[in-house]
């Protein structure tokens, strides 16, 4: 019903600050009345995904999916009210909405949303806002490392962040973790898919650096994972390629108006 912009104005849209001001105009009684009608298994977000091939499917995620996954992600990152997260990944994607925004909301961390990704703008934000954590895909980290402003950026407040979204070179994660580089000493990685809201496995702050740089960690609490042979459905031994399967609180409600595809997946 409304489009909210961050960092710029567009006709017919609300700026982020205007949206926040309007929120203050809503009586508390009305908020409580609306909240009473919301159920944990109500769909709160629909992400369109097609994987690498196929027709886009609307993944219906519930409050239960999103809040629980965000909470577990924040736990693994050891987020708190002392943290200030720069959100440079898209909010319309699970990386921004759950791994970043919701993990902050469940742990009381401060959010610093960016209107779009720019290595220059992100580095300036780290300086100005004393950022303690941020998430990104490997190409974002590379762009920041290679930017002329990188050496002028103060990373002394930085401590953690997620590198994920595509194959993460261990040497790139190690570089980000170095105290004389990005100072992201507790850098971690996540594995999952949109249908699992999205995280299923993740390393944690405090895990050995080798584990954090060379693996995608281990299953979240209350989530079961296995790797199967897609032809037989049988679990495969360690070291054998197969299809990743998971189940738990993070599993989507289904694909929007696609009952056959839902039945084949859930």
Model-predicted segments: where are they?
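Conserved pre-ATP/AMP-binding loop-to-beta segment of ANL
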Residues: 5-11, 17, 22-48, 55, ...
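Conserved beta-loop-beta connector loops within the AMP-binding
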Residues: 226-245
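Short beta-strand->loop structural element characteristic of the AMP-binding/adenylate-forming
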Residues: 57-60, 87-88, 109-116, 188
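Conserved ANL (AMP-binding/adenylate-forming) active-site segment centered on the GW(Y/F)…HTG consensus within
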Residues: 209, 251-266
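Conserved S/T- and glycine-rich ATP-binding loop of Class I adenylate-forming
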Residues: 43, 49-52, 85, 91, ...
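Conserved AMP-binding/adenylation subdomain of ANL enzymes
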Residues: 67-84, 92-133, 143, 147-148
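Gly/Ser/Thr-rich phosphate-binding loop
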Residues: 20-21, 131-136, 145-211, 224
């Amino acid at each position: 019903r409304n489009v909210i912009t961050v960092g710029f104005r567009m006709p017919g849209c609300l700026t982020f600050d205007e949206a926040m001001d309007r929120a203050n105009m809503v009586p508390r009684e009305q908020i409580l009345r609306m909240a009473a009608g919301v159920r944990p298994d109500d769909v709160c977000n629909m992400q369109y995904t097609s994987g690498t091939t196929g027709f886009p499917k609307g993944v219906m995620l519930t409050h239960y999916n999103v809040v629980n996954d965000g909470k577990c992600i924040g736990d693994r990152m050891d987020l708190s009210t002392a943290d200030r997260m720069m959100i440079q990944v898209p909010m319309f994607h699970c990386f921004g909405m759950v791994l970043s925004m919701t993990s902050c909301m469940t742990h009381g961390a401060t959010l610093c949303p960016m209107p779009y990704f720019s290595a220059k703008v992100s580095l300036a934000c780290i300086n100005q806002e004393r950022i303690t954590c941020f998430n990104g895909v490997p190409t974002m980290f590379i762009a920041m490392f290679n930017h002329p402003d990188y050496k002028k950026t103060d990373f002394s407040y930085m401590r953690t962040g997620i590198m994920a979204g595509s194959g993460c070179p261990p040497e790139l994660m190690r570089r980000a973790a170095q105290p004389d580089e990005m100072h992201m000493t507790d850098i971690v990685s996540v594995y999952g898919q949109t249908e699992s809201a999205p995280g299923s496995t993740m390393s944690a702050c405090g895990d050995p650096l080798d584990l954090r740089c060379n693996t995608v960690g281990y299953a979240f609490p209350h989530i079961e994972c296995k790797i199967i042979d897609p032809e037989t459905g049988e679990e495969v031994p360690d070291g054998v390629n197969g299809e990743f399967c998971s189940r738990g609180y993070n599993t989507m409600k289904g694909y929007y108006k696609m009952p056959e595809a839902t039945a084949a997946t859930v």
